[in-house]
């Protein structure tokens, strides 16, 4: 039951963030492999079980190392997103095409690889 609640809450927050935080929403897709690493870490740590299914400061402290795993990818994604948004204003003939081309090329150069130690787990 708790898992269903967490999934429903995550979906709701993801949809809401698509409009309120387009950069975060966009980068969540671009860094999906890193997000999977975070989720595997959370599952392994089982922080909610340790806090009797309560979301407390202890839960946050338990989960923080997992959340931090995705920082390298999100940091690079946010930088590239901002740069391409700046380089492709709505005044260019096709801003969406400009942005997607800019992002694809620039992010391919800087997206960090998941450390091999994490891939073996």
Curated annotation (Swiss-Prot):
GO terms for cellular component: extracellular region. It comes from the Eukaryota. The keyword Transit peptide does not apply. The keyword Signal applies. One of its GO terms (molecular function) is growth factor activity. Keywords: Glycoprotein, Growth factor, Secreted, Signal. Glycans are attached at residue 57. It is found in: Secreted. Interacts with the p75 low-affinity neurotrophin receptor. Evokes neurite outgrowth and modulated calcium currents in pedal motor neurons. May be involved in target-derived trophic support for motor neurons. This is Cysteine-rich neurotrophic factor. It comes from Lymnaea stagnalis.
